[in-house]
Amino acid sequence: MAIKTLKDLLAEGVEGRHVLVRSDFNVPLNDDREITDAGRITASLPTIKALVDNGARVILMAHLGRPKGEVNEKFSLAPVAEALSEALGQYVALAGDVVGEDAHERANGLNDGDVLLLENVRFDPRETSKEEAERGEFADQLVALTAENGAFVSDGFGVVHRAQASVFDVAQRLPHYAGTLVEKELEVLGNKVASAPERPYAVILGGAKVSDKLGVIEALATKADKLIIGGGMCYTFLAAKGINVQKSLLQEEQINKCKELLEAYADKIVLPVDLVAAAEFASDAENKIVAIDEIPEGWMSLDVGPKTVEKFAEVLATSKTVFWNGPMGVFEFENFSAGTRGVAEAIIAATANGAFSVVGGGDSAAAVRLLGLDEDGFSHISTGGGASLELLEGKNLPGVSVLES
């Protein structure tokens, strides 16, 4: 069944109606609680602006971090309310609670075109409860904020893979629609990448833990033409080939699984040929470029080397579809950012050459911004890390399937 979208809701009319919007405002903050990457906030603006311009009374729901079901000032959405006020050019009020007295009072007091941000939904343990009855109770209280004739817009793509109250259960209780962002993500990832990628199709996976991405690797190895593996997860694959990776990040319990994958997909999996080894895990650590089997004793690799970037770039240059998720090294340390930068630049070059490229959210999107790369050089930068991977894996996304019902 087709999913109704924001366009459908606007055609029905939203003037004077309370519209609950699930956004993704899970943005990184520094120690002074300043937002260091507002990408997700920027991505949420088209939906919010459209509702405001059409006279809706907008109630935003979102989470930040993992407060574990308790009110914790450290995870308050106050910095987000401030950033939204600035970006929208109008005051966005922050409720002092999620479904308490203050939230109700403020929701009841909204005028057409006003925006209210509820406090972090994960301050309530029922948001992430595994018990449907508990989530349902919380969802009922969220829906109660909308008065009569309310509607729900799902626009937090980064959370659609979660069966949580504000994502899944609220949608079951109100007329529901996909926001601009979710609609675009499903179109790009679902149609252009997952269903019918133009070939050759290359996937680049990085990031720390191989265990987090084993399911993805297995699923994509059958679908992609080339599977490039870098970042912290590549060392378990190198160890599976009998290489001593010294103190590099290693998940020994996954070595046999990596061996199986290397045997099954020998023609598809592409691994590093050189590395940037460091004496310790520090931004100013003594470091040198070495072959994969020449990491000095007691040292660790913190990035892929220049020959590896060249090798990966050759694969990307001939690809027509490219999906990238996960950095190639510890890009936050300048001395170990060249691998991630080199691969990102190779993807930009492939895109300029006609390839369709997607950056799969999370750390990769953060790396693009931190390294000052041209975001327009990629066809699409996704806002969902885990969600984009699960969509490509072919998994059921609760927050999407509920919109189809």
Swiss-Prot record:
**Listed GO molecular functions?**
ADP binding; ATP binding; phosphoglycerate kinase activity
**Which family is it part of?**
Belongs to the phosphoglycerate kinase family.
HAMAP family under this entry? Phosphoglyc_kinase
**What does it catalyze?**
(2R)-3-phosphoglycerate + ATP = (2R)-3-phospho-glyceroyl phosphate + ADP
Major location category of this protein: cytoplasm
Species for this entry:
Corynebacterium diphtheriae (strain ATCC 700971 / NCTC 13129 / Biotype gravis)
Q: Per its UniProt entry, what is the enzyme's top EC class, as one word?
A: transferase
Q: Where found, per UniProt?
A: Cytoplasm
UniProt subunit comment: Monomer.
Q: Which pathway, metabolic or otherwise, does it act in? A: Carbohydrate degradation; glycolysis; pyruvate from D-glyceraldehyde 3-phosphate: step 2/5
Q: Give the protein name, as stated in the record.
A: Phosphoglycerate kinase
Signal as UniProt keyword = no
